[in-house]
């Protein structure tokens, strides 16, 4: 049948991939299609393993078109120094911030990453954690259903810090939300709070339910861990 590729035929596969690269280049640079640029990145990463070129396309697509998922991936490149880029956490934070403000598959995770970097403090002018900014971006990601952000919020309210008082009620609220989203340690923390009546009314039955939920999540995570294979 015309148009179908026989993937057992090396020449057909080679021709197919070459055509794919040309098509993605055309979509990106001639048709000015940000999604075409992102497909070109997928091709460069997945087929050619050319991460230096992929970094250039990501930078172009993020800066020129503000493509959210490209900004997210460019931020990840800056975090590790991938694709020939100099490792730069401030640049990474800027990229994640752009992605956070844009619709996209990685928008919520980008907000979480902005929170993480603000919480860590290395990207801040004084090198100290910016707990207000961290809380704001964790909150956005948590509202978007990102479990790790909800858990981090619960930990912030659980521990407290200068200018950021402890609030066990909020700590429990965010632990419960993270637990509902499948975060095993959040379930364990919430269970303990209900068992002790710490920030909430003591409820041993609810504590037991949450403890069992934590156990079940842990069991599922262990089941999903792939064994190492050699040879």
From Swiss-Prot:
Protein keywords: Acetylation, Mitochondrion, Repeat
Localisation: Mitochondrion intermembrane space
Keyword ATP-binding in record: no
Main location (coarse class): mitochondrion
Each Sel1-like repeat, start to end: 34-66, 68-104, 108-146, 147-183, 184-219
Any one Gene Ontology cellular component term annotated for this protein: nucleoplasm
Molecular-function GO terms, alphabetical: protein-disulfide reductase activity
Signal sequence range: none
Keyword Mitochondrion: yes
Modified residues (N-acetylalanine): 2
Classification via Pfam families: Sel1
GO terms classed as biological process: respiratory chain complex IV assembly
SUPFAM superfamilies, per the entry: HCP-like
PANTHER family, per the entry: CYTOCHROME C OXIDASE ASSEMBLY FACTOR 7
Family affiliation: Belongs to the hcp beta-lactamase family.
Subunit structure: Interacts with CHCHD4/MIA40 through transient intermolecular disulfide bonds.
Function: Required for assembly of mitochondrial respiratory chain complex I and complex IV.
Annotated protein name in UniProt: Cytochrome c oxidase assembly factor 7
UniProt source species: Mus musculus
Lineage of the organism: Eukaryota, Metazoa, Chordata, Craniata, Vertebrata
Gene: Coa7
